[in-house]
């Protein structure tokens, strides 16, 4: 398996190895029950004298999330098998099972117990998983085989959308973001469920078109646009600057800052401006600790670092936030979260990832399982889909490769990227002002969009493909300059060389985790330009000094601004500690009298 699936070779050997462990873990979730068939269980733990061994039952939502990783590592046979398994236990009305006991064949599991179908999000997750598997593999035979079950799932979702806003509801469909805790009180529809359903809707038109179901295609297009509009408008809190948690049965909103909007951010479903606001809040320590993302902000009155849904750190949503940061071109906020999941590979049960951890200390909770598969999947998901930027589109014989490599990496090789029957290999090398890319393939021809990410403020960019000048149209974003290079891969090796002048990148901080530690690391909250100056916003502990490395043209500090009690004040809190060639190290000093975490913005020119 390891020799036929996606691997990376980067300057971070632990990251390369952690990906191999994650793929092994995702193979280990497969269980064959002689009475029920073969599918994915959620995790393993000790059973004691009378309990199940951790989450050793079949869990539909967990499995569907995990397929997002397996689609881009090439572990397709297991994905197709599990999607069929879940369809086998689909309820008559189309709802996909949340959990199936290993003893389900020996008791009245599906009728006498409330657990099999009590989650609403499992069905749109399964629909999304079918879509993503088809996009990666191009398996049209599977799509036609599963389509009757897919249509039943689609019709169930339509039956629980009752208020006309295009989004299915918790009140009619079941649980989604939370299972326990006051945070779920009075919820009519939460942003997590709304996001997963809207993501599923984005795949329905293409699949319906592929199987010739024109009626479903037309309905899905209209519903997709309606749902996305609701998601963007109903949940945005302009006063607070981030997306709310839920719409309430009372007609109001629950405006708590939670990790849940990341379910939409990871699919790029939110408009760019509001998404930036939410991503900045999620990047700060109130959600993103040194070791991962809390379910609920530490500033909430409901926050409890030991409570299941109200403050613990979950690796699976950590991956959601990491991928969301990459999706909106914010790699300096996404890397440390992915890196935390990487370090968990080696800090607890070797090669495994715990279910959840304390929101206050870097330690798993005693009552949770040490080997949870949707935690393991959230290393390859942000790594391959985010940092590497791989998006296969096998039905159209196409793919996108849009890497966002850390600014201090000089190379990266990616082996065995799969799109349908085509294997793609990529080697990327960088030095000051130059990126060189070698691309190769084996299998049927594909159209590849290679999207280079150049430092913010870059100028005079040129592209050569196989030694010949290649015209491209640069695309500016708030955080980088993108150069899309279109080419056909059909076996022969292709070389891309990109040159530019100027520009500046920030190196994401690395945080070496120690079991039991509290959260004290630096966060890059934002990096953009304003009035010709680069603007670097960081968050750290008062009284602490931090180092941040910049790579690109030499810069000087224009001014430094602190945010304190809602009022900004200018203060000399930053200095250039080192500068040579294209490297500038900043020393950032937060005032000693401010012992809480504070936001600091440095303007550079």
Language model segments and positions:
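Acidic/polar, glycine-enriched structural segments that form the non-catalytic walls/loops
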Residues: 1-54, 135, 140-145, 154-156, ...
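Extended glycan-interaction surfaces of carbohydrate-active proteins
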Residues: 9-58, 81-117, 159-189, 229-313, ...
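Extended, well-ordered alpha-helical scaffold segments
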Residues: 17-22, 74-88, 140-158, 204, ...
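Conserved, compact domain cores that house catalytic/ligand-binding motifs in diverse enzymes
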Residues: 17-68, 72, 526-605
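Aromatic-rich carbohydrate-recognition surfaces in CAZymes
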Residues: 53-167, 190-198, 312-334, 338, ...
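A general alpha-helix detector
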Residues: 65, 203, 260-263, 320
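Extended, hydrophobic/aromatic-rich amphipathic alpha-helical segments that build helical scaffolds
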Residues: 129, 194-209, 222-228, 323
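Non-catalytic C-terminal accessory modules of carbohydrate-active enzymes
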Residues: 285, 320, 324-569
């Amino acid at each position: 398996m390891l020799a036929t699936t996606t691997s990376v070779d980067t300057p971070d050997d632990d990251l390369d190895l952690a990906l191999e462990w994650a793929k092994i873990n995702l193979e280990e979730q497969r269980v064959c029950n002689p009475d029920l068939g073969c599918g994915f269980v959620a995790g393993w733990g000790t059973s004691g004298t009378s309990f199940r061994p951790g989450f050793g039952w079949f869990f539909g939502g967990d499995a569907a999330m995990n397929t997002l990783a397996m689609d881009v590592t090439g572990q397709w046979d297991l994905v197709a098998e599990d999607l069929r398994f879940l369809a086998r236990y689909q309820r008559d009305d189309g709802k996909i099972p949340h959990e199936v006991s290993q003893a389900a064949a020996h008791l009245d599991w599906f009728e006498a117990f409330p657990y099999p179908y009590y989650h609403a999000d499992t069905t749109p997750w399964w629909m999304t998983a079918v879509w993503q598997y088809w996009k990666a593999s191009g398996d049209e035979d599977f799509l036609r085989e599963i389509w009757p079950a897919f249509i039943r799932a689609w019709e169930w979702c339509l039956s629980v959308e009752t208020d006309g806003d295009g989004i299915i509801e918790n009140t009619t469909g079941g649980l989604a973001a939370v299972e326990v805790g006051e945070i779920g009180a009075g919820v009519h529809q939460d942003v997590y469920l709304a996001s997963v359903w809207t993501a599923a809707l984005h795949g329905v038109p293409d699949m319906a078109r592929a199987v010739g179901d024109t009626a479903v295609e037309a309905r899905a297009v209209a519903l997709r646009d309606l749902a996305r509009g609701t998601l963007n408008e109903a949940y945005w809190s302009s006063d607070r600057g981030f997306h709310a948690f839920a719409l309430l049965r009372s007609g109001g909103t629950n405006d708590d800052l939670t990790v849940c909007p990341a379910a939409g951010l990871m699919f790029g479903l939110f408009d760019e401006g509001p998404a930036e606001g939410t991503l900045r809040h999620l990047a700060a320590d109130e959600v993103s600790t040194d070791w991962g993302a809390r379910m609920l902000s530490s500033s909430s009155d409901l926050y409890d670092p030991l409570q299941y849904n109200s403050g613990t750190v979950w690796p699976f949503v950590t991956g959601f936030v990491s991928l969301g940061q990459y999706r909106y071109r914010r790699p300096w906020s996404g890397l440390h979260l992915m890196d935390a999941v990487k370090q968990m590979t080696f800090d607890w049960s070797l090669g495994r990832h715990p279910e959840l951890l304390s929101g206050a200390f870097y330690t798993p909770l005693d009552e949770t399982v040490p080997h949870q598969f949707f935690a393991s999947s959230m290393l390859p998901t942000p790594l391959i889909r985010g940092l590497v930027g791989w998006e296969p589109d096998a039905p159209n014989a196409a793919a996108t490769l849009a890497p966002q490599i850390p600014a201090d990496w000089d190379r990266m090789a990616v082996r065995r990227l799969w799109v349908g029957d085509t294997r793609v290999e990529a080697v990327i090398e960088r030095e000051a002002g130059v990126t060189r890319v070698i691309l190769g393939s084996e299998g049927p021809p594909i159209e590849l969009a290679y999207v280079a990410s150049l430092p913010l403020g870059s100028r005079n960019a040129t592209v050569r493909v196989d030694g010949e000048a290649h015209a491209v149209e640069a695309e500016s974003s708030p955080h980088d300059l993108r150069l899309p290079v279109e080419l056909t891969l059909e076996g022969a090796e292709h070389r891309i060389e990109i040159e530019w002048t100027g520009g500046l990148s920030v190196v994401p901080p690395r945080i070496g985790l120690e079991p039991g530690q509290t959260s004290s690391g630096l966060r890059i909250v934002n990096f953009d330009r304003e009035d010709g100056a680069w603007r670097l916003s960081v968050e750290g502990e008062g009284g602490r000094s931090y180092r941040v490395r910049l790579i690109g043209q030499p810069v000087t500090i224009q001014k430094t601004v602190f945010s304190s009690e809602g009022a900004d004040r200018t203060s000399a809190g930053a200095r250039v500690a080192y500068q040579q060639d294209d490297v500038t190290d900043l020393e950032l000093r937060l005032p000693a009298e401010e012992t809480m975490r504070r936001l600091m913005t440095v303007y550079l020119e």
